[in-house]
């Protein structure tokens, strides 16, 4: 699909259903080729900058492995690895990196930052995560659901439970609308997505034969789901009072066996973008337990470790789908 050549990947809302389907099909093809040893490098002699204002395990590893598999060279610029925002404007950084690199990945805070990089760099820019959006994650989520459920995308009933305002919830709603899915967002009313985004997604869903439901009624929201999805409730760096208020709001929305059973679907699967606070076995998890008495946050360990959980297949698919995005926008077919 030549019209993806040299395009940036900033938000799924920039892409048509046909284009998203193309990226997902290409992901399947590249994954198959890697598994059977027939992968052909289509990014040979390309130089890629990975610009991270936020640390990451999956996003960094996915981009680096995908790039190396495809023959590209990678430079990682971590939170202290560039002058962007400190001694140099985003606009200037974009023009500097655009003169040296063939593509730029950005993972950080503001959606406006990744948009500025795309506007001024002159090369494809890929959104690895912002506070508002997480489009590469959604490609992996959808691919995993199709692989496990053996259903067409439009036939998947996809439900997100938790903080309806966060970047993953936003991106999933966008993607589901584009793909014509039946999408439910189950969250407290105080954490509903913005009206602007919701109305836009509802219009897109209607055009594609899909449906979007926003509800705080857990029973109504999860009934008939093929996928139950959640994400962490809090982010590092937020004030204590924000954590306390949000934890109280979201306690009833913890994904546990009861919620999985309420779907009425014995084949329902559980997805999560990771990392997850499903126990107190991490430094942050222990701090949360000591301060708030919560040992399991957004999902119980029982569900996380159950046969319904596909989170590690989903994590692997970050690499295959990110590879597809880079190949489609930068590769030599």
Swiss-Prot record:
InterPro entries: Asp/Orn_carbamoyltranf_P-bd (IPR006132), Asp/Orn_carbamoylTrfase (IPR006130), Asp/Orn_carbamoylTrfase_sf (IPR036901), Asp_carbamoyltransf_Asp/Orn-bd (IPR006131), Orn/put_carbamltrans (IPR002292), OTCase_ArgI (IPR024904). Pathway: Amino-acid biosynthesis; L-arginine biosynthesis; L-arginine from L-ornithine and carbamoyl phosphate: step 1/3. It catalyses: carbamoyl phosphate + L-ornithine = L-citrulline + phosphate + H(+). One of its GO terms (biological process) is citrulline biosynthetic process. Pfam families: OTCace (PF00185), OTCace_N (PF02729). It comes from the Bacteria. It is an enzyme of class 2 (transferase). It is found in: Cytoplasm. Belongs to the aspartate/ornithine carbamoyltransferase superfamily. OTCase family. HAMAP family: OTCase. This is Ornithine carbamoyltransferase. It comes from Staphylococcus aureus (strain Newman). The lineage of its organism: Bacteria, Bacillati, Bacillota, Bacilli, Bacillales.
